[in-house]
Amino acid sequence: MAKRKNKKVDDVAIDTRGRILEAARNLLLKRSGGEVSMAEIAKEAGVSRQAVYLHFADRGSLFVALVKYVDEKRGLQEVLDTIRNAPTGIAALRAMAAAQSRTNPDVWPLARASEAIRRTDEAMEKAWQNRLQDRHSGCKAIVKRLAKEGSLREGLPVDVAADLLWTITSIRTWEDLVLERKRKRSEYEEYVSEVLLRVLTSQP
């Protein structure tokens, strides 16, 4: 009986946590990554501020959890698997540009908010740096594959190529091209893919 009761309590806690994270995500999307307070998140989730703080000690810990939550919602693992399982390194480059084009509209508001929070929150800064490093490692894996297949541009060091791939496909580049310069999603994908192939590969 006690186990059943504890399970119900756990289920309620998980449900409340999910509602809080979904509320935070929705508010960030509505405000394009603008400032969102814990009180506003509580109101959006239909819970008290106290309930929010029971699950998340502060705004930094909430946003660290939110990053993981959004990754799960957008199927990040499937996105990464598509890139890794591409038939060639060149196909992986194209898949990466396509993935950035498709997922960045949802990621950008959270990235914008996280970048502001990380400057004053140690946990958020650590999560941010880990994320950057993970993405760079993925870029380097693609470049190594290009080199192994003989597709990497002659004379281009692997480390330099990885840095270029990491930078060209960064969310900041996407922001500049799509949000600032008003390029369409299809244009971003097409032109970024072409730049990557011309800069990184020996393909004519």
Model-derived regions, located:
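Hydrophobic alpha-helical connector segments
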Residues: 65, 78-106, 162
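Generic hydrophobic, amphipathic alpha-helix propensity
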Residues: 13-24, 41, 66-70, 74, ...
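Short helix-capping/turn signature of helix-turn-helix
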Residues: 56, 116-121
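N-terminal intrinsically disordered/low-complexity leader segments
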Residues: 1-15
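Helix-turn-helix
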Residues: 19, 27-61, 65
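Amphipathic alpha-helical packing segments from all-alpha helical-bundle domains
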Residues: 102-113, 123-149, 159-163, 194-201
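Hydrophobic/aromatic-rich alpha-helical bundle segments in the mid-to-C-terminal region
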Residues: 147-195, 203-204
